[in-house]
């Protein structure tokens, strides 16, 4: 990563650990683009990563020995050579545009050319189970903060600061929202449907969670009960703790669903309970891979000595998954701004079936 700051690495890791959230039964196509300047270490590093339903399927990395769009899932390998050549050309063109924008951002924010800066973009669409558009995304960021984003109406922009207001006005004059909306409502949805069809054995499968409860004594004398759900797909899952049939929403700690690094996901929910009262509490797990919801409780047949082993089982996949994804993704964390200038952000959306499945704005300023 060269000169990337530790803070940026932590933010990227946090983003990598957290899959995007979609409505149960829906599907998503997302692209995450990152350009990181690194003075003294050559040109900025540029990466693109594509996800279908939180599963990485394509990647481009300018630091690769032979930078090209690469398949990251077996089902995408069936695309022909023209697909990979087209996507590689587009990615290399966008790489140059993002590098120009990084330099422009320095002028907008009166920053020194000696530091490392990050420009990121995320776009994609969510569709219902019947293929209808649920929501579109088109967001830019710079150096750790939001910059500008297309609103849910896909017609207007939200600008985060004064510099972004300049961009908003230019994009409004150029009709950028209309062109972005056309992509999100058209090509994005069409390509997502195609990917779901081609990768149905992987993307439309259901892996039920393996669930168990662990027991952790606290210095205060009470106990933490933690309910684990492992190895499930898709990512949508519900974990709740109950006491006498009532959900303990306020008392419960719930982590974000996290990738395990093997194509499945993990999650846990915990609650602090009085020592000796553990069996009064039940964990409830709901997932589309289960024929019916699971109900679990801590039992005397499951001794506290097993806690360490169970914790290690989940910790190792989470860490490995984070490393794999961080190395693969440079994942999206909403950043501060996106720059346009003299040409007002010209967009290249190729029409027809041979068009790219992903269209980025021409970032020239």
From Swiss-Prot:
<keyword id="KW-0812">Transmembrane</keyword>
<feature type="region of interest" description="Connecting peptide">
    <location>
        <begin position="299"/>
        <end position="311"/>
    </location>
</feature>
<feature type="signal peptide">
    <location>
        <begin position="1"/>
        <end position="24"/>
    </location>
</feature>
<dbReference type="InterPro" id="IPR037055">
    <property type="entry name" value="MHC_I-like_Ag-recog_sf"/>
</dbReference>
<feature type="transmembrane region" description="Helical">
    <location>
        <begin position="312"/>
        <end position="334"/>
    </location>
</feature>
<protein>
    <recommendedName>
        <fullName>H-2 class I histocompatibility antigen, D-D alpha chain</fullName>
    </recommendedName>
</protein>
<feature type="region of interest" description="Disordered">
    <location>
        <begin position="343"/>
        <end position="365"/>
    </location>
</feature>
<feature type="disulfide bond">
    <location>
        <begin position="125"/>
        <end position="188"/>
    </location>
</feature>
<dbReference type="InterPro" id="IPR007110">
    <property type="entry name" value="Ig-like_dom"/>
</dbReference>
<comment type="similarity">
    <text>Belongs to the MHC class I family.</text>
</comment>
<dbReference type="GO" id="GO:0010977">
    <property type="term" value="P:negative regulation of neuron projection development"/>
</dbReference>
<dbReference type="InterPro" id="IPR036179">
    <property type="entry name" value="Ig-like_dom_sf"/>
</dbReference>
<keyword id="KW-0391">Immunity</keyword>
<dbReference type="InterPro" id="IPR013783">
    <property type="entry name" value="Ig-like_fold"/>
</dbReference>
<feature type="modified residue" description="Phosphoserine">
    <location>
        <position position="356"/>
    </location>
</feature>
<keyword id="KW-0490">MHC I</keyword>
<dbReference type="InterPro" id="IPR001039">
    <property type="entry name" value="MHC_I_a_a1/a2"/>
</dbReference>
<dbReference type="GO" id="GO:0001913">
    <property type="term" value="P:T cell mediated cytotoxicity"/>
</dbReference>
<feature type="region of interest" description="Alpha-1">
    <location>
        <begin position="25"/>
        <end position="114"/>
    </location>
</feature>
<keyword id="KW-1015">Disulfide bond</keyword>
<feature type="region of interest" description="Alpha-3">
    <location>
        <begin position="207"/>
        <end position="298"/>
    </location>
</feature>
<feature type="glycosylation site" description="N-linked (GlcNAc...) asparagine">
    <location>
        <position position="200"/>
    </location>
</feature>
<keyword id="KW-0732">Signal</keyword>
<keyword id="KW-0472">Membrane</keyword>
<dbReference type="InterPro" id="IPR003006">
    <property type="entry name" value="Ig/MHC_CS"/>
</dbReference>
<feature type="topological domain" description="Extracellular">
    <location>
        <begin position="25"/>
        <end position="311"/>
    </location>
</feature>
<feature type="glycosylation site" description="N-linked (GlcNAc...) asparagine">
    <location>
        <position position="110"/>
    </location>
</feature>
<keyword id="KW-0597">Phosphoprotein</keyword>
<feature type="disulfide bond">
    <location>
        <begin position="227"/>
        <end position="283"/>
    </location>
</feature>
<dbReference type="Pfam" id="PF06623">
    <property type="entry name" value="MHC_I_C"/>
</dbReference>
<comment type="subunit">
    <text>Heterodimer of an alpha chain and a beta chain (beta-2-microglobulin).</text>
</comment>
<dbReference type="InterPro" id="IPR003597">
    <property type="entry name" value="Ig_C1-set"/>
</dbReference>
<dbReference type="GO" id="GO:0005886">
    <property type="term" value="C:plasma membrane"/>
</dbReference>
<dbReference type="GO" id="GO:0042612">
    <property type="term" value="C:MHC class I protein complex"/>
</dbReference>
<dbReference type="Pfam" id="PF07654">
    <property type="entry name" value="C1-set"/>
</dbReference>
<dbReference type="GO" id="GO:0098553">
    <property type="term" value="C:lumenal side of endoplasmic reticulum membrane"/>
</dbReference>
<dbReference type="GO" id="GO:0001916">
    <property type="term" value="P:positive regulation of T cell mediated cytotoxicity"/>
</dbReference>
<feature type="region of interest" description="Alpha-2">
    <location>
        <begin position="115"/>
        <end position="206"/>
    </location>
</feature>
<dbReference type="GO" id="GO:0030670">
    <property type="term" value="C:phagocytic vesicle membrane"/>
</dbReference>
<dbReference type="GO" id="GO:0009897">
    <property type="term" value="C:external side of plasma membrane"/>
</dbReference>
<dbReference type="InterPro" id="IPR011161">
    <property type="entry name" value="MHC_I-like_Ag-recog"/>
</dbReference>
<feature type="modified residue" description="Phosphoserine">
    <location>
        <position position="359"/>
    </location>
</feature>
């Amino acid at each position: 990563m060269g000169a990337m700051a530790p803070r940026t690495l932590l933010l990227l890791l946090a983003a990598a650990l957290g899959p995007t959230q979609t409505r149960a039964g829906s599907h998503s196509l997302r692209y995450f683009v990152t350009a990181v300047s690194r003075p003294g270490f050559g040109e900025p590093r540029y990466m693109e990563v594509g996800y279908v339903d939180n599963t990485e399927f394509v990647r481009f990395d300018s630091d690769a020995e032979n930078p090209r769009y690469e398949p990251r899932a077996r089902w995408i390998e069936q695309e022909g050579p023209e697909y990979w050549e087209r996507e590689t050309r587009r990615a290399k063109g966008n790489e140059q545009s993002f590098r120009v924008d990084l330099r422009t951002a320095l002028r907008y924010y009166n920053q020194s050319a000696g530091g490392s800066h990050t420009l990121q973009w995320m776009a994609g669409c969510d569709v219902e189970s019947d293929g209808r558009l649920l929501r579109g995304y088109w967001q830019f960021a710079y150096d750790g903060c939001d910059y500008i984003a297309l609103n849910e109406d896909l017609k207007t922009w939200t600008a985060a600061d004064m510099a972004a207001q300049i961009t908003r006005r230019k994009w409004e004059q150029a009709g950028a929202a209309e062109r972005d909306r056309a992509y999100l409502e058209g090509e994005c949805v069409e390509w997502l449907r195609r990917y779901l069809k081609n990768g149905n054995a992987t993307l439309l499968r259901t892996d039920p969670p393996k669930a168990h409860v662990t027991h952790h004594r606290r210095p205060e004398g009470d106990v933490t009960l933690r309910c684990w759900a492992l190895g499930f797909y898709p990512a949508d899952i519900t974990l709740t703790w109950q006491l006498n049939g009532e959900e303990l929403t306020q008392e419960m700690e719930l982590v974000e669903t996290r990738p395990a690094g093997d194509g499945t996901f993990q999650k846990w929910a915990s609650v602090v309970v009085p020592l000796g009262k553990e069996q009064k509490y039940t964990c409830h797990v709901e997932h589309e891979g289960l024929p019916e919801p699971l109900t679990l409780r801590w039992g005397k047949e499951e001794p506290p000595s097993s806690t360490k082993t169970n914790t290690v089982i989940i910790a190792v996949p989470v860490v490995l998954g984070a490393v794999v994804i961080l190395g693969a993704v440079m994942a999206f964390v909403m950043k501060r701004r996106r720059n346009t200038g003299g040409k007002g952000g010209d967009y290249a959306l190729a029409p027809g079936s041979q068009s790219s499945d992903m269209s980025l704005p021409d970032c020239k300023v």
